[in-house]
Amino acid sequence: MKLHSWQISYVIGLAIVAPLLLLETLGLHFIPENIVPYLELIGGIMLIAGSCEAFVLSVEGLAHNMHLTDYVAGIYASIASTIPELFVLFFLIIGGQYEMAWILALATIFMNSLVFAVYSLVLPKDHEGNYRLPDAIHHVGSDLLTMGSVISLSVGLSMMLVHLFPTHGTALIPQYLDSSELILFGFCLIIVFVAYLYRITKYYGKVVPNTDDPLLDSDLVSMPMPKNVLGIFLFIAALGAALGGEALSSFAHFASGPEGLNLPIIHAALLLVVFGGTPEYIIVASSHRKDEIEVALSNAFGGIVQVFFVIFGFTMIASGILGYLDPNLLGHEILPIELYSVVLLLFAFPTMFILRTMITDDAKINALESVSMISVFIMMLYILLFYGGI
């Protein structure tokens, strides 16, 4: 039997990560310590790449059984492909790296926005040089971008004001976010995204038979997936996501730690975003190559809104709960309010706002808008890379 590329990637990644984890558990050190983090990085990426594809195939099978449109099926596939990143963040939070998890989640939004802008350049255009965006993005996705940009701006400015200005009597407000605040903010984001999923599935999710609108049709070639096969795929995907996430979180400790690469925290987060996001970028490119434009577009767009509302929301909830259970913190002073934690949250505002503006003006996107977005994101990336190391 010939293995698919994702299966080969999964097997190789598992063959690298599992022995490393076993040796660490047993306290054995046969491999030089300076080589182990790089093996964890390579194995984690390959394992997560295979896990992402297994999750996507599972969701595509379910979508076929439920007669979902290509775009909405792609949204659920994109959500599934973020599960490995949730494991990465979970292991970072378990290790007490609350700020690293916060920065990693926000840096992912920024990098995925750049990917969406670049991908919008290669979308097939009509005779006027425009690509008509699905109604789900125009009518519902734009609302989500509006809410996300307002939330990021208001919370970011509030954190900055708390950090800069004293209260009456010159006493400073505690310059940390506590467990209760993180849990509250996180639940608010998750609730908004659940409402988004409900609306987009109910009104844009079902295939309309014999329709002339390609956005309400389905061209995905996937077979119905029996429950036992679905269970196997989900188990394989979850196992790979957990092991790969643990491996990448270990590399994150190495990249930002004084005994490792000792990179500034923003540089380490951006490095991890590039490596950890590679599987999702491959999914976008692969779907486009197979002419599954709606699936590729939903993955690219979902990499922005889903990361902010799901991954960032999960990060805050998990940090709040585990910080409360931490005997050293007891729910207090979990996340420091400082430059790095604030700047990326504020940067999420122009990132999502410019996307929202480009989408809502005429429900179309052209090369001028794509180049404009890319230019803005490159300037922001330069600021992060240059000033993030100060």
What do the predicted segments below correspond to?
Residues M1-I390:
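Hydrophobic alpha-helical segments, chiefly the membrane-spanning helices
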